Every structure is written in structure tokens, then in C-alpha cells.
Amino acid sequence: MNVTLLIPARYGSSRFPGKPLAPINGKPMIQHVYERASLAKGLTDIYVATDDDRIKDAVEGFGGKVVMTSAEAASGTDRIEDAITQLGLAEDDLVVNLQGDQPLIDPISIEQIISLFERHPGEFGMATLGFQITEEEELNDPKHVKLVFDNEFNALYFSRARIPFGRDTDDYPVYKHLGVYAYTRKFVQTFAKLPLGRLEDLEKLEQLRALEHGHKIKVAISAFDSPEVDTPEDIRICEARLAVD
């Protein structure tokens, strides 16, 4: 099975312009993401998918590969679809979508999501990661998307609210969604043609589109958190964690 990992990265960000190139311990953030991903076993290739020449130059500068995507891409999925079309991937090839703002991603988590497709061939077209929340402040923070899943680890729902809600107790595990996806090329093409979902639009969570249209999303629970960098303040947190990693 060919497995291509794509790291979508865009320069424009209302909260943090130029985020992929923000220096973390002397290297641009996108380099940390690329290098940590490259440690995962089972990958055929890794590319950064971007429409910005500054990001392209930075990635090629440290020896990484780039696929240039259209500046008209309306969503992350559109950028992924553009990239896989250019790369000429086969329908049953696996694509891992790792966000460019996760410099702390653990390669074992990437291996976990790949192994789901190896152990359950043909049972689903899309998979993602979850992590049990350990920080109290994350429970009710809408920035941290929560998820619930059934006994077979199929996602039931994703929400910015705390789910599930314990009516009589707060003593139960709550899981947050880690922004890593894997899917077959065929599923990406199917997903991109689906109309915007009502719940997707309410929560502003693209993955809900798959659930709303009856598609399974398999979940692997990671033992490693992968916090995203959303603001310049998050850089300092990453630097501290990388120093002891």
C-alpha cells in the first residue's frame, strides 16, 4: 500500500500571518512538522501542499518536497484533492493529511492511523486521531474539538462543546480531536463532491460533512497529544516542550 503524507500549509492567517515559517528553536515550524512526520514508518512519500512561494522556498531549502496547489482552494480538502490529482495517486493509495501547525506530532500517532487501514481494509474510507484530555481548561474551550465514538471506535460526533455531558458526574474521560486524517484517494474525491452539511456549517468542522452523509470515520486513540499552534504565544509552549522531547 502506497502511503503519501501531505502537509497543507498556507501563509495567510488572520490570527497569525506567516505561521508555517514562524521560527521554533531556530527552525521554521513547517520544518519541525516535516521532520517529525518523516520519522513515521510506512510512508512512501511526504509533500508540503502550499500555494505560497515563500513556504515552497523554505521547504526546498531544508530538502523537503513541495506540491504547489491552487490559490483558489476553498478548504483544506480542496487543497488535498488538488495535490493528489497533481501527484497522480491511484484510487486505493492512502493519503495522510497532517496540518502544518502541529510541530509536536509524534510519529507513532501517524503509524497508528495508517495501521487502521492495514487492519480493516475496505471497511471505511476515512480515519482520524483522538486523545484523552488531561488539561482541565481544554474541556470547555471551543478551540479544542471534542469527539465521541462507539464501541468499535467509529466516530459518532465532533463538537466544540464538551461531549458527552455527564448529568450526574464529571468523573469520566473526554477525548479531543487531533487534526490528523487519513483516507483513500477515492474517498477524498467522494468527500469533495458532497454538499456542505448543516452541522458542519454550525460547528465549522469539515469532518462532520462525512458523518452527515453517512460515511464512517474510524478513530485511533493516541497516547501522545499534538497541540496546534494558533497564536504567537503558542510558539513558546512548543519551544519548551521540544526542549525536553
Curated annotation (Swiss-Prot):
Subcellular location: Cytoplasm
Pathway(s) where this gene product acts: Bacterial outer membrane biogenesis; lipopolysaccharide biosynthesis
Keyword Cytoplasm: yes
Function: Activates KDO8N (a required 8-carbon sugar) for incorporation into bacterial lipopolysaccharide in the Shewanella genus.
Principal cellular location given in the protein's record: cytoplasm
Family, per entry: Belongs to the KdsB family.
Protein name: 8-amino-3,8-dideoxy-manno-octulosonate cytidylyltransferase
Domain of life (superkingdom): Bacteria
CDD domains: CMP-KDO-Synthetase (cd02517)
Name of the gene: kdsB
GO cellular component: cytosol
Keywords: Cytoplasm, Lipopolysaccharide biosynthesis, Nucleotidyltransferase, Transferase
Naturally occurring in which organism (per UniProt): Shewanella piezotolerans (strain WP3 / JCM 13877)
Nucleotidyltransferase found in the keyword field: yes
GO MF terms held by the record: 3-deoxy-manno-octulosonate cytidylyltransferase activity
GO biological processes: lipopolysaccharide biosynthetic process
Entry EC no(s): 2.7.7.90
Pfam families, alphabetized: CTP_transf_3 (PF02348)
Catalytic activity: 8-amino-3,8-dideoxy-alpha-D-manno-octulosonate + CTP = CMP-8-amino-3,8-dideoxy-alpha-D-manno-oct-2-ulosonate + diphosphate
